[in-house]
């Protein structure tokens, strides 16, 4: 984000990175998650799932975000309260969300389908049925080429 988009990085982390890392990214530590939520235009969640982070982003915390802010989650689905996020998206409490993990996966809360301000992707894009079929077909093509004394398209040396 810093180098690619020129974004100013602010963060809250219980495991503070080294001064060298903070300086490298010209980052500013905040004293709490709440402080980040109040200041950030883009909030990107990076934490493990589990009891301590369950619904870390709940209705109250989502409500602390700027009206024009975007929430990004590629960590774990249960870190965000889906119902609270859907409500915030529909009410334009925040500008939008980008998600590739969802609470209750593999099921998707159908409320997300009515949110034009949400971008939804599979966490493991290569796990889609279409992609897996294409991968299998490619293996078969490589095997066929090999057994016909031809160069496989995806030769591994």
Regions found by a protein language model. Name each.
Residues 1-67:
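Rossmann-like dinucleotide/phosphate-binding beta-alpha-beta segment
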Residues 68-157:
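Rossmann-like dinucleotide-binding domain for NAD(H)/NADP(H)
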């Amino acid at each position: 984000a810093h180098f690619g988009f020129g974004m100013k990085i602010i963060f809250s982390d219980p495991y503070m990175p080294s001064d060298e890392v903070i300086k490298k990214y010209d980052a500013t530590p905040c004293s709490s998650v709440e402080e980040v939520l109040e200041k950030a235009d883009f909030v990107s969640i990076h934490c493990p799932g589990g009891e301590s982070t369950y619904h870390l982003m709940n209705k109250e915390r989502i409500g602390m975000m700027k009206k024009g802010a975007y929430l990004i989650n590629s960590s774990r689905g249960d870190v965000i309260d889906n119902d609270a996020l859907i409500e915030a998206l529909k009410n334009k409490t925040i500008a939008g969300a980008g998600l590739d993990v969802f609470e209750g996966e593999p099921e998707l809360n159908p409320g997300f389908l009515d949110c034009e301000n949400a971008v939804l992707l599979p966490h493991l894009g290569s796990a889609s049925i279409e992609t897996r079929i294409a991968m299998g077909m490619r293996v078969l093509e490589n095997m066929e080429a090999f057994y016909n004394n031809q160069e496989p398209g995806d030769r591994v040396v």
